[in-house]
């Protein structure tokens, strides 16, 4: 009894620490008038506008994205030269003709490829969304041969024009726009009270579970995933998860397509109308509590209703929403969108319904995986409770569906490895269906099918093994060729780079064949430079676009707890131990090679030194295989510590949520 009281006191202390941390930030940031970035130019691979010679004027027009603009920032490049001169910077509201600010810049103060910030007079910051601004930079004087330049993007990414001496130029000036945060002290207190209510509820659940005695480990996961997932679902603004907006747009296209809607003929020739596209593009503003204000304003409106004057936001918007991806990974979202449209839900209600169904399906898939696994249950639970996976399950990301299917496939494979009787048709059909769905959604997970090569031969009925492999490989290959035909075409021809400038040449298979040593070097450079970041980000070191970065100590805590979950207890016996380890390691290495190889051919420029587009979350579906491969027999734990590991994951997630509450409450 004394030990339990000590545990409760310790958890209560952590609870009070979290409340104090949230309250402190709520009080301080309510008084300091903090600002946040609301729009920026993605200047990846940026170039200059040309030397700013005396008399040169560079102007960028941009539409207002927020009512209360407080600051702008322009990115300059000095090319390593010291310039003794002056620049004039002005900001004009072209709609009203009002000058919002004039500034003089000494070029000696500029930092190479750094942003120079310009504060706007507080009396002139109240704008309207239909206002057009013009940012002009002119060179007043400069020392000869030592000129500076303004960084610009190679593509048109803003809704405006870039001109040099009134001559139009491609791309856009590298800018950042800021607004004042309007989340006052009283609202912050409400936010803190909501956080406290959650933490008290969670603590009550924790106490009830431990007072009730020993329960199955799978129910621990169901309760913890449910509580934590719902918190992430409502605490993180819509579209704050990586690529969430893009996936929601594709799901919306699929919903229109499956309900027999004709494609829109015109600029985009898609299954989204201009009104639908405008609503989605409007939601791409950097997520913050301003997003909640938009939601509140449009919560009762008809589906995808937008302001009449917002269609200028379509200018230059080249967001890809074609239903070229398989619909399987979007199934929960498609169902939610179809239901929402049928009953007339508003845009944001549809978004949250899609999030909720995605969360529900993912949780059921992981729960099913944990239920059928004969061992490694705690390992699967630990990875499923990482902050990154929790963020994905509570968003519209299609990665959550793929992750759930991959975990279920691995769980069923382990069950078949341990099975003593002959395999039934349903046993093998389940594996075939799961790997078909996984490979159709993301082909670089296709190596998972090789796990079945380790299945004991004696468990197959006579003649079944050969037929099993034919039934296995044929649908997987056909699924990849059909659903990913556009991607395969781009990879084979090198005609497109997914996350870059389509005008730049991408890597092709021909480059791989002609320069194998360079490709090997790129693989090693990528892993050596970014390997640690891939691991940390897979756990949750960077959550979405909100710059939520939990402490490195917490990330190491998640990794350490996951490693402990692999160590067997003394009373555990192993069947096919060495075979499982070897095949798991081989499939993991091959999967990593396929992931990086696919991104090499689809997202990497010919001039790049490392492979582009690789993200830590791509490795999560195959990470259990690495952990199984690292499992040994020599190191053992005296008794089962599964419940203690679950408690560790709960405490670590509690501390991460303190960070999430703290960062969200200051925005």
Placement of each model-derived feature along the sequence:
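Beta-sheet-rich sandwich/jelly-roll-like modules and their strand-loop junctions
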Residues: 3-6, 10-95, 110-115, 122-130, ...
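Membrane-lumen/periplasm interface segments of multi-pass, membrane-embedded glycan/lipid transferases
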Residues: 185-188, 483-570
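Transmembrane-helix motifs of polytopic, lipid-linked glycan transferases
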Residues: 205-206, 352-375
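Transmembrane-helix signature of polytopic, membrane-embedded enzymes
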Residues: 216, 345-348, 367-387
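Interfacial juxtamembrane loops and adjacent helix segments
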Residues: 258-353
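Membrane-interface alpha helices of multi-pass inner-membrane proteins
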Residues: 391, 427-443, 448-454
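Short acidic/glycine- and proline-prone juxtamembrane loop motifs at membrane-interface regions
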Residues: 395-402
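Perimembrane helix-loop-helix junctions
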Residues: 412-422, 446-477
